[in-house]
From Swiss-Prot:
Extent of the signal sequence: none
Polar residues bias locations: 728-744
Oligomeric and partner information: Interacts with BRD7, PRMT2, TP53 and NXF1. Associates with histones and BRD7.
GO MF annotations in UniProt: enzyme binding; RNA binding
Gene name of the encoded protein: Hnrnpul1
Residues where Phosphothreonine is found: 210
Protein name as it appears in the record: Heterogeneous nuclear ribonucleoprotein U-like protein 1
Linked residues for Glycyl lysine isopeptide (Lys-Gly) (interchain with G-Cter in SUMO2): 117, 143, 147, 163, 271, 450, 540
Segments annotated as Sequence repeats: 613-615, 620-622, 639-641, 645-647, 659-661
Domain notes: The RGG-box domain is methylated.
Residues with the Phosphoserine modification: 195, 513, 721
Matching PANTHER family: HETEROGENEOUS NUCLEAR RIBONUCLEOPROTEIN U FAMILY MEMBER (PTHR12381), HETEROGENEOUS NUCLEAR RIBONUCLEOPROTEIN U-LIKE PROTEIN 1 (PTHR12381:SF41)
Disulfide bonds: none
Length: 859
């Protein structure tokens, strides 16, 4: 698929199919789609390799996100056997010497080059380029899409018009609204009716649990762990580049003199971050308790040494040691044999930085300290003692944690064995109802379950700078940052459905469709809904308090829409239990019904996905057009589409009561005679007229008209109507007696108006095949002269045909003022029709008194 040749609509369709964001300019959409395609490519490549040689080891499918194309956090795939170390700069040799890493850099190349590199690969090994025959990978789905593309040399007429019109829409900017916070973007995501794909089962790795390694259960969802469990890196695509990502080791210690090493293998390129982002590449290394979060150094009993040359604990940062960056090796030492204290110190490339922390053993309470790392856009590797030689010299008297007897190591919390043991709690409630407060308290009161809170607030906690939350005085666009955090959350939810953990989904979740959509991927979990529904007075007080603390988070119109659509969950196919925390079910039902009524009264009418005013979209089909305006004609008719490529049912001649469109095919179209068979003011068809690109029929040679017998009664004079006439109303019928045209001969049910005498006469003329004639009231005029308009051929009048005998009905004549009023309204109507200036702008509509439509044609 050549993404650069896709149109904007096609790009959006491809992104929507993958669950990606469809907003942005064409260049951004193409960049996003290319990144998704590159992320999908390794999975297809591995599947083909497995089919070619099923005997190769290590072909377990890597976890790949079901939507969005980004790779899910998990363990990485080892390289095929026989791949030798490749000692190029920026890579590293693994502990067994089989492979080196490089494609961490490649996962973000799409931000700096037009050709998108692989965003997230199964592992960050360095593979020689000649061993990656990506051009041989077969993509049947992509090939099908390429067949549907038009050849680059061919552009239909409408395509060029659309291309010229498109930039004016791309340059429009949405007005900035300061009160678009995290709740607003959660609300927008909940309104989207996506159907999630069922998650694939997580691969079960046969890993020796007695080894000290990175714990895949005690790490962030967006931290990717290699299959050897000694290295990892974070996701960095889009908003993930703002996030810290942490991981802890599987074993800790509480006695002895223990150490481990950490090497920064690469600073991953994140050129999509703004230049104002402070410290886009940082690593913090140290120790923490098993009960601490992954945010190293930002809470008690969490001790870290950062690459900015600072140490931190409980979010208190102090200068310490030297700064460190890519390719530096940091040694971490814990000395439990210093009397009543525990001393933590660090080395940089073998140079001792001094004692960083002294902790009282009583404060620890006999709890073990675990190796811990927190990274931001960096790939790291640990040496717990599995390497034959350390990276750098180790302080005398210290032992690598891997070399300690198993009895002296303390295993961290072990995760659930199956999904049936896992639990997901879905919070349900309006903004500021207290969902986040309840979730934090519940997680703290159940530390053994290690709840992962999935919410925008938790995402923002991982975007801290120097331990401080980003506030609205953030240098960039706050609403853009919040929107990126919401997108990160959506991907984390997809990742979470494949991991055996306990979760709390901290969002509003008031839409019934959102509740169902978010719970279905967690099939097999214990799925529970936690409804926070305070009284209306409490909700108002909490909203005011939250606004004072954080600013206005959700616009009022979004809150009203949530109220109008608030649905209390029920136990059913996607929920095993529903718990009400404040108001119970009966009281909550009454309050929710009140909210529904309040929201429906205050909000706009419900949106319609499709317009019911016509068939098809904008007249592209044969059964009618998607109407740009309301129906203003008689019943059964539509105002017409702008672009009709179909036949009679659209804006062409075959459709009844249409305003008339621009028809590019032969099944209808603008007729040569404007006031002909589909007269605009005809009560039966009410079509304004059609234009046909077909060659004009030449009129017959000029013949003298036969003598006209005097009519028994005057024919119906022209009556005038400025707009669409309802059935039975009077109409202005400009009867034409040109051969080949059909004048309106229907008799209105209400008598029309006859202009006062003396009458006027407009001779018929030919203007480039656009013919119109007027027949004056009796007595009949002499044969009209022929006019020649420049290069247009002379008019050859056809034989005059006398009009049919009129009916015996008489028509009262209106006053001159009424006629002038109708003419003025007719002129005003055509002044508003700026969409068809080539056809109507220079047309002479009679030049009669009171008309402002224009004089004679200047063509």
């Amino acid at each position: 698929m050549d993404v650069r040749r896709l149109k904007v609509n096609e790009l959006r369709e491809e992104l929507q199919r993958r669950g990606l964001d469809t907003r942005g300019l064409k260049a951004e959409l193409a960049e996003r789609l290319l990144a998704a395609l590159e992320a999908e490519e390794p999975e297809d490549e591995r599947e083909l390799e497995a089919d070619d040689d099923p005997g190769l080891p290590g072909h377990n499918n890597e976890e790949v996100e079901t939507e969005g194309g980004s790779e899910l956090e998990g363990t990485a795939q080892p390289p095929p056997p026989g791949l030798q170390p490749h000692p190029e700069p920026g890579g590293y040799s693994g502990p067994d010497g089989h492979y080196v890493m490089d494609n961490i850099t490649r996962q973000n190349q799409f931000y700096e080059t037009p050709v998108i590199k692989q965003e997230n690969e199964s592992s960050y090994d360095r593979r020689p380029l000649d061993m990656e025959p990506q051009q041989q990978v077969y993509h049947p789905e992509l090939k099908t899409e390429m067949k549907q593309e038009a050849p680059p040399s061919f552009l239909p007429p409408e395509a060029s018009q659309l291309k010229t019109d498109r930039p004016q829409f791309q340059n429009r900017k949405r007005p900035f609204e300061e009160n678009r916070g995290r709740g607003y973007f959660e609300h927008r995501e909940d309104r989207r009716g996506r159907s999630p794909q069922p998650p694939a089962e997580e691969d079960e790795d046969d890993f020796d649990d007695t080894l000290v390694a990175i714990d895949t259960y005690n790490c962030d969802l967006h931290f990717k762990v290699a299959r050897d469990r000694s290295s990892g890196y974070p996701l960095t695509i889009e908003g993930f580049a703002y996030l810290w990502s942490g991981a802890r080791a599987s074993y800790g210690v509480r006695r002895g003199r223990v150490c481990f090493e950490m090497k920064i293998n690469e600073e991953i390129s994140v050129k999509h971050l703004p230049s104002t982002e402070p410290d886009p590449h940082v690593v913090r290394i140290g120790w923490s308790l098993d009960s601490c979060s992954t945010q190293l150094g930002e809470e008690p009993f969490s001790y870290g040494y950062g690459g900015t040359g600072k140490k931190s604990t409980n979010s208190r940062f102090e200068n310490y040691g030297d700064k460190f960056a890519e390719n530096d090796v940091i040694g971490c030492f814990a000395d439990f044999e210093c009397g009543n204290d525990v001393e933590l110190s660090f080395t940089k490339n073998g140079k001792w930085m001094g004692i960083a922390f002294r902790i009282q053993k009583e404060a620890l309470g006999g709890q073990a300290l675990y190796p811990h790392v927190l990274v931001k856009n960096c790939a790291v590797e640990f040496n717990f003692g599995q390497r034959a030689e350390p990276y750098c010299s180790v302080l005398p008297g210290f032992t690598f944690i891997q070399h300690l007897p198993l009895s002296e190591r303390i295993r961290g919390t072990i995760g659930p064995k199956s999904k049936a043991e896992c639990e997901i709690l879905m919070m349900v409630g309006l903004p500021a109802a207290g969902k986040t407060t309840w979730a934090i308290k519940h997680a703290a009161s159940n530390p053994s379950k290690k709840y992962n809170i999935l919410g925008t607030n938790a995402i923002m906690d991982k975007m801290r700078v120097m331990g401080l939350r980003r506030q609205r005085n953030y240098a960039g666009r706050w609403d853009v940052l919040i929107q990126q955090a919401t997108q990160c959350l959506n991907r984390l939810i997809q990742i979470a459905a494949r991991k055996k953990r306990n979760y709390i989904l901290d969002q509003t979740n008031v839409y019934g469709s959102a509740q169902r959509r978010k719970m279905r991927p967690f099939e097999g979990f214990q799925r529970k809904a936690i409804v926070i529904c305070p009284t209306d007075e409490d909700l108002k007080d909490r909203t005011v308090k939250r606004t004072d603390e954080e600013g206005k988070d959700v616009p009022d119109h979004a809150v009203l829409e949530m109220k109008a659509n608030f649905t209390l969950p029920d136990v059913g196919d996607f929920l095993d239990e529903v718990l009400f925390i404040e108001l119970q079910r009966e009281e909550a039902d009454k309050l929710v019904r009140q909210y529904n009524e309040e929201g429906r009264k205050a909000g706009p009418p419900p949106e319609k996905r499709f317009d019911s005013r016509g068939g098809g979209f904008r007249g592209r089909g044969g059964g009618g057009g998607f109407q740009r305006y309301d129906n203003r004609g008689p019943p059964g008719g539509n105002r017409g589409g702008f672009q009709n490529r179909g036949g009679g049912g659209g804006s062409g001649g075959g459709g009844g009561n249409y305003r008339g469109g621009f028809n590019r095919s032969g099944g209808g179209g603008y007729n040569q005679n404007r006031w002909g068979n589909n007269n605009r003011d005809n009560n039966n068809s009410n079509n304004r007229g059609n234009y046909n690109r077909a060659p004009q029929q030449q009129p017959p040679p000029q013949q003298p008209p036969p003598p006209q017998p005097p009519p028994q009664q005057p024919p119906p004079p022209p009556s005038y109507s400025p707009a669409r006439n309802p059935p039975g109303a009077s109409s202005y019928n400009k009867n034409s007696n040109i051969p080949g045209s059909s004048a309106n001969t229907s008799t209105p049910t209400v008598s029309s108006y006859t202009p006062p005498q003396p009458s006027y006469s407009q001779p018929p003329y030919n203007q480039g095949g656009y013919t119109q004639g007027y027949t004056a009231p009796p007595p009949p005029p002499p044969p009209p002269p022929a006019y020649n308009y420049g290069s247009y051929g002379p008019y050859n009048p056809a034989p005059y045909t006398p009009p049919p005998p009129p009916t015996a009905q008489t028509y009262p004549q209106p006053s001159y003022n009424q006629y002038q009023q109708y003419a003025q309204q007719w002129s005003q109507y055509y002044q508003n029709q700026s969409q068809w200036p080539p056809y109507y702008g220079n047309y002479d509509y009679g030049g009669y008194s009171g008309s402002t439509q224009g004089g004679t044609s200047t063509q």
